[in-house]
Amino acid sequence: MTKLIIHLVSDSSVQTAKSAAHSALAQFTSLKPKLYHWPMIRNSELLKEVLSKIESKHGIVLYTIADQELRKTLTKFCYELKIPCISVISKIIKEMSVFSGIEIEKEQNYNYKFDKTYFDTLNAIDYAIRHDDGQLLNELQFADIILIGPSRTSKTPTSVFLAYNGLKTANIPYVYNCPFPDFIEKDIDQLVVGLVINPNRLIEIRETRLNLLQINENRNYTDFNIVQKECLEVKKICELRNWPVIDVSTKSIEETAALIMRIYYNKKNKYKK
């Protein structure tokens, strides 16, 4: 495989550059990337340290830096080394400016914007933590999304990922031969999504979990027939109520969350007046 070095340089968390890099790398199966993360680069001294690293390990540079002088220094340095230096969002900003007719603001503030979106995200994260694994079922009416599924079908990490996108998400496990919460008998406005997985894959995940916890006796947890029944029962519950079901067998958490968000916003837009 061809090796590729990528330097992610940002005056913030490098998350934007990282997401862009991973999206691009997904198109190349024969590349073996090595990513270097350089977050919180907000002055010339910090940038100088990064430049020395870039010089010692040539590769593509992806950056999100607001300060004009730092950008100039970085791009000039890369130009002299004859390596690509790409601004992840400059093209987007330029097109927004052209389309809206509003000039790009020159003064940048490094502080996060403490607006409604910021606090909505904090509230969503808090909600996801407090309503994990079937907790506080009496507060489901405050959720945007409710996930149901057998244990170890990525309900918790998916809930947290959705919360980081501002969506209050509760998750409820389905356990074989245990009564399911009676909320399913009610007419609710929240989006309910069932998560299922290939039984063999789920057994592998559960066995790994038990080994990590050094638990030797929990036969029902990894019994094929029971695991299969759990997945089938979740499908049945959802199909009877026209709730969507997602098979997460071959999906990453990001992919699962993206599908859920698409369903959520399609539903929201459909009923928006």
Curated annotation (Swiss-Prot):
- Residues reported to bind ADP: G149, P150, S151, R152, T153, S154, K155, T156
One matching Pfam family, short form?
A: Kinase-PPPase
What keywords appear on the UniProt entry?
A: Kinase, Nucleotide-binding, Serine/threonine-protein kinase, Transferase
Coiled-coil ranges per the record? Answer: none
State the top-level EC class: transferase
Superkingdom to which the source organism belongs: Bacteria
EC number in record? 2.7.11.32, 2.7.4.27
> What is the catalytic activity of this protein?
N(tele)-phospho-L-histidyl/L-threonyl-[pyruvate, phosphate dikinase] + ADP = N(tele)-phospho-L-histidyl/O-phospho-L-threonyl-[pyruvate, phosphate dikinase] + AMP + H(+); N(tele)-phospho-L-histidyl/O-phospho-L-threonyl-[pyruvate, phosphate dikinase] + phosphate + H(+) = N(tele)-phospho-L-histidyl/L-threonyl-[pyruvate, phosphate dikinase] + diphosphate
Keyword Nucleotide-binding belongs to the record: yes
The Gene Ontology terms for molecular function here are: ADP binding; ATP binding; phosphotransferase activity, phosphate group as acceptor; protein serine/threonine kinase activity
> InterPro entries from the entry?
Kinase-pyrophosphorylase, PPDK_reg
Q: What are the annotated disulfide bridges? A: none
User: Which residue ranges run through the membrane?
Assistant: none
Q: So what family is this one in?
A: Belongs to the pyruvate, phosphate/water dikinase regulatory protein family. PDRP subfamily.
Cross-referenced HAMAP family? PDRP (MF_00921)
- PANTHER family found in the cross-reference section: PYRUVATE, PHOSPHATE DIKINASE REGULATORY PROTEIN 1, CHLOROPLASTIC
| General function of this protein | Bifunctional serine/threonine kinase and phosphorylase involved in the regulation of the pyruvate, phosphate dikinase (PPDK) by catalyzing its phosphorylation/dephosphorylation.
User: What name does UniProt use for this protein?
Assistant: Putative pyruvate, phosphate dikinase regulatory protein
Give the organism, scientific name: Rickettsia bellii (strain RML369-C)
